[in-house]
Amino acid sequence: MSHVKNTMDTPLNILHTWKGISLQEEQTTLPNGKTITHTTISHPGAAVILPIENNGNIIVINQYRPSLKKWLLELPAGTIEPNEPVELCAVRELAEETGYSAETMISLGQVTPLAGFCDEIQYL
């Protein structure tokens, strides 16, 4: 059941695009009937991998994030390419970021970490 609807008859107003991500603006009617202009970051989604070694150790990567101007320990992850299955993205990102390959892949579901202003879904 959808509680929010797009009231525009025309496509979204694309304010900016970069590397498959776009900043979009649209008129939206909220559940209380109020119409607002809402800005959303549109993102193609990402695969996030929780790599666990046979001995139980979890593999993380140390990655510099310019937006925060600091190093962070993170799970391997990456943006899903157009028409790429999530599982293939996970395999690709695990190899690219860690050099590891997985014996088994198990889906742990999905999260939407920035749902207030971004439509990115992260598949675990």
Tell what function each PLM region has.
Residues S2-H16:
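Extended interaction-bearing regions that mediate binding to partners or small molecules
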Residues S2-V4, I41, A47-R92:
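Conserved Nudix-box catalytic region and its N-terminal flanking loop in Nudix hydrolases
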